[in-house]
UniProtKB/Swiss-Prot annotation:
NCBIfam families on file: PRK01253.1
Coiled-coil regions listed in the entry: none
Protein name per the record: Preprotein translocase subunit SecG
GO cellular component terms attached to this protein's record: plasma membrane
InterPro entries for the chain: Preprot_translocase_SecG, SecG/Sec61-beta/Sbh
Alphabetic keyword roster: Cell membrane, Membrane, Protein transport, Translocation, Transmembrane, Transmembrane helix, Transport
Organism taxonomic ancestry: Archaea, Methanobacteriati, Methanobacteriota, Stenosarchaea group, Methanomicrobia
Function: Involved in protein export. The function of the beta subunit is unknown, but it may be involved in stabilization of the trimeric complex.
Record topology, Cytoplasmic segments: 1-29
Membrane topology: Single-pass membrane protein
Transmembrane intervals: 30-49
Length: 55
C-alpha cells in the first residue's frame, strides 16, 4: 500500500486559521456574564415592583 502524503498539512492549516481567529475574538469572563445577568434580573424585579406589576 502507498502512503498518503500531504494529509497532515491540510488539517494543521485549518487549526492555525481557527487559532488566529480565536485570538482576535472578544473574550468575556464567565463571572462577568453571571453578574450582568443577576443585575438585569434584579432590575426587572425592581421595575415591576415599582410599577405595580408584582404578582
Amino acid at each position: 500500500m502507498a502512503k498518503r502524503s500531504g494529509s497532515g498539512l491540510q488539517s494543521s492549516a485549518g487549526l492555525m486559521r481557527y487559532y488566529e481567529a480565536d485570538k482576535n475574538a472578544v473574550h468575556i469572563q464567565p463571572k462577568t456574564v453571571l453578574i450582568v445577568g443577576a443585575l438585569a434580573g434584579i432590575a426587572v424585579l425592581f421595575l415591576s415592583a415599582v410599577n405595580g406589576f408584582w404578582p
